[in-house]
Amino acid sequence: MGSPKKNENKGFFAAMTSGFSMFGTAVSRSVNGVQGNEGVEVINPEGGKEDAEEEAQKGRWKDEERDSYWKMMQKYIGSDITSMVTLPVVIFEPMTMLQKMAEIMEYSHLLDQADECEDPYLRLVYASSWAISVYYAFQRTWKPFNPILGETYEMVNHGGISFISEQVSHHPPMSAGHAENEHFIYDITSKLKTKLLGNSVDVYPVGRTRVTLKKDGVVLDLVPPLTKIHNLIFGRTWVDSPGEMVMTNLTTGDKVVLYFQPCGWFGSGRYEVDGYVYSAAEEPKIMMTGKWNEKMSYQPCDAEGEPLPGTELKEVWHLADVPKNDNFQYTHFAHKINSFDTAPAKLLASDSRIRPDRYSLEQGDLSKAGSEKHSLEERQRAEKRTRETKGQKFTPRWFDLTDEITPTPWGDIEVYQYNGKYNEHRDTAESSSSASNETDLKSIEFNPWQYGNISTE
């Protein structure tokens, strides 16, 4: 068993690579691109003058800033730069990593369908399509803010979901998240790891993602591919996620293996995803194909991976309408995440929405966003010094560190488990308060801090 790329000598994907399948080939797309056909994006992997000019028009890098950061970044080549480099606010988006974690819930109805599905293989089609759907949002090239230790993000009013995420560690940076509705439970512990390669950076999704489908108690485990950010400083920045995504049904042993094609010149292969749902006996049952920025489809297949006679390709997911010319390439759902429409009553003061640097950037005030970001970082350093002086440790509020260590392709990760206290908090908040309006919520002062006025500690 393996990815389609590893099975090129047989089955449905052999037809793809030989050039006569109904999905076409990367070669034909490249030729079409040379001929000037519309719809093909010409990608220069190394960047170029035109790309640099396009980035400059976005207001991200001035020439003097670009040169200065290039000189600074050279000494970090080969290093994990997750939290060791202070970056200018001009390259940030008005969202934190905790909020970005919630973007995977946009198409949560696919998990509802997976829970209701009786077919164990089709169930994996729904669930893996849900996992793919977030990659449209992941292609944004703006950097989200690193959460402050103890920062949280809450979301309600979407698909019956209650979502909570919390920054549980600062060094190394780690976040934990939990979401639940009547159909599923979602849990994630994330410890992103990076490697600077000069003008590009690899982002390794070190973490553990589990989905429990409530109807049958099925537990799904997700291992996503790495992400590559190209032309970080010079050229037009773009994002790719080449490699395998594997979702395993830990209850039955069935799994789906999807291969994200790497992007080549003229955009060949970019966005394409192909793979199979396998039984526990490693026999292909359903083939899947599509583009992570558009749609996914599936079709039952035989033991050789060929479509079964009398069946047809069926769409399982497609991208919802997105805003045109959005400043940060946000989807409508991303705007909902930032809004107070999805905020619960008695919003926690540690919530990312009311973080002053994020909010200032959202309002277009880069100068204030930069100064607020600096103030928060200085306060966090002061808290760390106070914590060390007192001989104390930070304890997350909504998640508990377990003894479990989970291996990943990019290193081990300590697992944080949702402790259930947020449910109790929400029940109390909703029963004891009237609904707050947006003005009331905006008046809350951002407070993720462990200590009070640390200058007097």
From Swiss-Prot:
GO cellular component, one term: cytosol
InterPro entries from the UniProt entry: OSBP_sf, Oxysterol-bd, Oxysterol-bd_CS
Keyword set, alphabetical order: Lipid transport, Lipid-binding, Transport
Compositionally biased spans, kind Basic and acidic residues: 47-61, 370-391
One of the record's GO molecular function terms: lipid binding
Signal sequence extent: none
Record region (Disordered): 37-61, 363-393
Expression by tissue: Expressed in roots, leaves, stems and flowers.
GO biological process: lipid transport
UniProt xrefs under PANTHER family: OXYSTEROL-BINDING PROTEIN 8, OXYSTEROL-BINDING PROTEIN-RELATED
Function: May be involved in the transport of sterols.
Similarity comment text for this entry: Belongs to the OSBP family.
Protein known as: Oxysterol-binding protein-related protein 3C
Species of origin: Arabidopsis thaliana
